[in-house]
Amino acid sequence: MTYAIVPGDSLKAFMDRLDFAVQQYPNHIDFPQTENGAAEAFEPNVTGFFSAIDIRGARNVAFACRTFYSTGRAVPWMLSVLKPLKIYPSKFFADFAEWQLCNNCDYKSGFLPESQNHKDIEKMQLVFLDEKYEEKRCQDMIPLVNDIVKINGAMSRLVSDDEEAVIETSYNPDD
């Protein structure tokens, strides 16, 4: 998915495309403009519809999605976790982009999500989700959200990395 390439594109149109894409449960979403070496082939154009500030914002949102959703293997649980927050995926990724900037793991810092261990990305996801659920006054759901992320993360590492895991849940699984 690109931004500021096609004539008439805008930040709103990019965010709408991102929201639509996440609703389709894709295994990952590629953003060639955030990948090393590919940026020159997809140079964004400043227009009356897409300012330089909008382009930086779109790049940061794309990088946040790449980190949280694709590298973070959030496909199976993303929409379930967003529903109680009553927030669109694009807004969630925009907030995560701001969080990444504050935690020195954004696009400009040179952070490469694919070079990180999945457990490290999962820790980032859990910290950010805790903050979002507190912000939206949904603290009572934090243990459930943490369990969903941890269980799915452990299953994805078992399938992808052949890594077994013992996870601690907030409930007794035998009940």
Model-found features: residue ranges?
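Radical SAM enzyme core and accessory elements
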Residues: 60-175
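A structural motif corresponding to the C-terminal lobe/cap of the Radical SAM core domain
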Residues: 1-94
